Amino acid sequence: MARRRRRACIALFLVLLFAFGTLMGLRTLKAPDGLPALGPGLELAPFERRPEGAPAPAARAPAAPAAPPPPPPPPRTADPGGSPGPAPAEAEPAPVQSLRVYSDLHAFYYSWYGSPRREGHYIHWDHVMVPHWDPKISASYPRGRHSPPDDLGSSFYPELGPYSSRDPEVLREHMTQLKEAAIGVLVLSWYPPGMADDNGEPSDDLVPAILDTAHQYSIQVAFHIQPYKGRDDITVHDNIKYIIDTYGSHGAFYRYKNSMGKSLPLFYIYDSYLTSPEAWAHLLTPNGPHSIRNTPYDGVFIALLVEEGHTHDILAAGFDGMYTYFASNGFSFGSSHQNWKAVKNFCDANNLMFIPSVGPGYIDTSIRPWNNHNTRNRVNGKYYETALQAALTVRPEIVSITSFNEWHEGTQIEKAIPKKTPTRLYLDYLPHQPSLYLELTRRWAEHFIKEKEQWLM
């Protein structure tokens, strides 16, 4: 009898433990503090980029709670594998050329990939595993380089395989996917001619093909200037002049119409904090010694917001706005959804643009195996929709997506497929189709545009 009672107590304890674990797991999916739960019709569907080896900046205190946006459209009827989203899905996909894109939706794009068929060898797909900066920690993790096509520097496997960014068919397919997602501006990761990141090769000569292909799909191209060796206010002045002189007359070159009615090129400056505000002010303030203001090379310059103190640095430097880039909520002050309302208030008070960056998830352990604490699971699209809702809550002029195809950090919305090789089992978008994140993006893009119309009334 005592034995039976003991077994019953153990069983009851296990049931309670399971229930507690499930409850705590569900708590991780709730909207961050300071954000409303998704409104009617916006229920979640069931469906870091930083210098390599650098430590993660600490997140700061949460901002004041944000006011919810106007009520969204009514929910769609869920099918057995789905649940409501911002708008009903099309019964039949529309022809790509007839699909509308929105210039207020930007996506970060990488053209650094190469394959033996085009370049004679793999580029970036064979990314090295970056060692941790602490040798003691680094010793516990694998080192070396990935070996495509079975072993990629990515936790997901692209539907196109380990492709070359120079392949015209790949470019056309990418533009098709961008258009399916309603993305109107491709933000191209850019290095000056003859320069590249540590794992890549120069690719400025590919820009004309990207512009030409984008133009065929009514997509525009903006530039995301990367932190190459020796970058400062003087070299960026030369970069801006080169980009505008070389590409500024192309029909796909993106220009943003500001509040004064002037159409100016828009540039994102990655890791802008590496240069002092005083140096940037030489370039970006009207009285700077080599100012581009009120010259043919004037533009809209968007700085990267990482730490809270960067807001004042960005203002003093003469930038026109700030973006957050990182797709890992909580990784930095800027990437934390709960801080976006405070950032938007600061920007509004100082005539700056705030461009929040949203992503479908984050996992870079294929190239930084020690960085699993920054992984953000996709939860079949829920993480992405939570980020999109957080962005719309602050009523931004533009929303940026991290990313279309940064495969190393697992932030891509590009189509991925299930894949198992002798050495790897890749993540995928199951139980949904490879186009899941393109479909979610279009649905939210259309909702974003409708919301903006209400904001302006």
From Swiss-Prot:
<feature type="topological domain" description="Cytoplasmic">
    <location>
        <begin position="1"/>
        <end position="8"/>
    </location>
</feature>
<dbReference type="GO" id="GO:0004559">
    <property type="term" value="F:alpha-mannosidase activity"/>
</dbReference>
<dbReference type="InterPro" id="IPR026071">
    <property type="entry name" value="Glyco_Hydrolase_99"/>
</dbReference>
<feature type="compositionally biased region" description="Pro residues">
    <location>
        <begin position="65"/>
        <end position="87"/>
    </location>
</feature>
<feature type="topological domain" description="Lumenal">
    <location>
        <begin position="30"/>
        <end position="457"/>
    </location>
</feature>
<feature type="compositionally biased region" description="Low complexity">
    <location>
        <begin position="53"/>
        <end position="64"/>
    </location>
</feature>
<protein>
    <recommendedName>
        <fullName>Glycoprotein endo-alpha-1,2-mannosidase-like protein</fullName>
        <ecNumber>3.2.1.-</ecNumber>
    </recommendedName>
</protein>
<keyword id="KW-0378">Hydrolase</keyword>
<keyword id="KW-0333">Golgi apparatus</keyword>
<keyword id="KW-0472">Membrane</keyword>
<keyword id="KW-0812">Transmembrane</keyword>
<dbReference type="GO" id="GO:0000139">
    <property type="term" value="C:Golgi membrane"/>
</dbReference>
<feature type="transmembrane region" description="Helical; Signal-anchor for type II membrane protein">
    <location>
        <begin position="9"/>
        <end position="29"/>
    </location>
</feature>
<feature type="region of interest" description="Disordered">
    <location>
        <begin position="46"/>
        <end position="93"/>
    </location>
</feature>
<comment type="similarity">
    <text>Belongs to the glycosyl hydrolase 99 family.</text>
</comment>
<keyword id="KW-1133">Transmembrane helix</keyword>
<keyword id="KW-0735">Signal-anchor</keyword>
<dbReference type="Pfam" id="PF16317">
    <property type="entry name" value="Glyco_hydro_99"/>
</dbReference>
